[in-house]
Design a protein with these regions (language model features):
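N-terminal leader/linker segments that initiate helical-solenoid repeat arrays
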Residues: 2-106, 126, 405-426
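TPR-repeat structural position
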Residues: 45, 79, 86, 121, ...
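Alpha-solenoid helical repeat scaffolds
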Residues: 46, 50-53, 87, 94, ...
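Generic helix N-cap/helix-start motif at coil->alpha-helix transitions
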Residues: 63, 100-108, 134-142, 169-177, ...
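Residue at a conserved register position within TPR or TPR-like alpha-solenoid repeats
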Residues: 73, 80, 115, 149, ...
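Structural motif corresponding to the intra-repeat A-B loop/turn of tetratricopeptide repeats
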Residues: 76, 80-83, 118, 152, ...
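Amphipathic alpha-helical segments of tetratricopeptide repeats
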Residues: 91-98, 133, 166-167, 199-203, ...
Length: 426
């Protein structure tokens, strides 16, 4: 017993010393260390995928090895942004679950998560509901079900799902999803506090893959940026870089932060680091704007064309960021409206309805746009872009007083919104 206790004390002492050394490193050294570790971890992940892929070739009708392979593909897809790996994860998980449904909820969850990552919301929801129904005590399926209800805009169902998760709302599988639910209802203070708590908890999970820990920093940064807290967003991004300095999701958000700061060369720097890994349509649209603002019309047009190519190559529904770019840059307005209407028939979430309202407005359907944006505002969400679009629609509808109120609220919620600053001549 004493020997076991001594070993435990020694382990804790060594772990504490290692953490102390790590935190005393400069930011540059921490990121260099993290980059080396991520390269090593990705190489190990590649080897594990090769190992299980070889086993599956020998035993294609099993479930366990194929299920493990699907989880590894999903992990690599998340880390690298590879759509091919997400598709491989879906195929392997579907095969594993098809081979054996009993005691194989892990494969079903990988299937649901890979479908969600490819924006196949309805099928992901169906799979998740079937898993959640098998065991109501499992947190992850219930939390994913609630998240998908938010994605689909089924807010009554989401309310019931999150109510059932109230006791677990601080746990990592639930916390960021619960925070998003709070934000949609206008409870921003509680949402922010919950995101910070989840980030702090995740940062201590050293066995958690780096891309997952980085994701919690990303959520804090994204919330801060959308609410005009630029220094807070930059700080969260810095913490994310300490974990995953080459994470394309962090770089994409960095480009958005640079745009909010009018740092258009910075947008292109961060954007180039993003698209070197993943042709993200939202980032390409932002880069097109950055190039245009700096007088590079040819470069702007090239980024815009690349964005359209990237959208065409991606699976799933129409990319919302690309749709917004086209609406604001005189693209094919009737086609964008048609695609946006099709998306809204599946997803009735606030951001999809906001985009539909903006497409209706750009196509001259002002009355319909007002009805649609009113549905969004009725949720209580505080979002400067939504309020800016609502103010434009209200003005076109002849309600100048309401337009002014909405514009004022947008400035209060996020004065750094690019559209607001352009209007002010900044």
């Amino acid at each position: 017993m004493r020997r076991w206790l001594l070993a435990l004390v020694l382990f804790i002492a060594l772990a504490t010393a290692s953490l102390t050394v790590y935190h005393n490193l400069s930011a540059s050294d921490r990121r260099s260390t993290a980059a080396i570790e991520r390269t090593r971890d990705l190489a190990i992940l590649d080897q594990r995928i090769e190992f299980y892929a070889a086993r599956v070739v020998k035993e294609p009708h099993g479930a366990l090895d194929i299920g493990r392979l699907s989880a590894l593909y999903l992990q690599r897809g998340r880390q690298t942004g590879s759509y091919e790996d997400l598709s491989r994860a879906e195929t392997a998980a579907r095969t594993s679950y098809g081979n054996r449904k009993a005691r194989n909820s892990g494969a079903a969850m990988v299937l649901a998560q890979s479908l969600l990552a490819q924006h196949q919301y309805l099928e992901s929801y169906a799979v998740t509901c079937s898993v959640a129904a098998l065991d109501s005590t499992e947190i992850e399926p219930r939390a994913l079900k609630a998240e998908l209800e938010l994605e689909l805009g089924r807010y009554s169902d989401a309310a019931a799902s999150f109510k059932s998760l109230e006791a677990q709302k601080r746990q990592l599988p639930v916390a960021t999803r619960y925070a998003r639910w709070l934000e949609i209802g206008g409870h921003d203070i509680e949402a922010r506090e919950m995101l910070f708590a989840a980030e702090s908890l995740a940062s201590k999970q050293f066995r958690m893959p780096s891309e997952q820990r980085a994701w919690f920093h990303l959520r804090v940064a994204d919330f801060a940026l959308r609410h005009g807290r630029l220094a807070e967003a930059a700080s969260a991004l810095s913490r994310g870089y300490d974990v995953a300095p080459d994470d394309y999701r962090l770089q994409a958000l960095q480009a958005r932060l640079d745009a909010a700061r009018d740092d258009w060369p910075g947008v292109l720097r961060a954007g180039n680091q993003t698209i070197a890994q993943v042709l993200d349509p939202a980032t390409l649209g932002l880069m097109a704007d950055a190039a245009a603002i700096q007088g590079d019309s040819a470069g702007s047009a090239q980024y815009a064309r690349t964005m359209l190519v990237a959208v065409a190559a991606q699976p799933g529904p129409y990319h919302r960021a690309a749709a917004l770019y086209l609406l604001d840059h005189h693209g094919d307005l009737p086609e964008v409206l048609r695609r946006t209407e099709a998306d809204a028939r599946v997803r009735q979430d606030v951001y999809g309805l906001e985009l539909l309202a903006w497409a209706q407005y750009r196509n001259g359907q002002v009355a319909a746009a007002m009805q649609t944006i009113d549905r969004v505002l009725a949720t209580g969400v505080n979002d400067a872009q939504i309020e800016f679009h609502a103010s434009e629609i209200a003005s076109a509808n002849g309600d100048n007083a309401r337009a002014a109120t909405l514009r004022s609220k947008a400035r209060s919620d996020n004065a750094s919104l690019v559209a607001l600053r352009r209007e002010s001549g900044h």
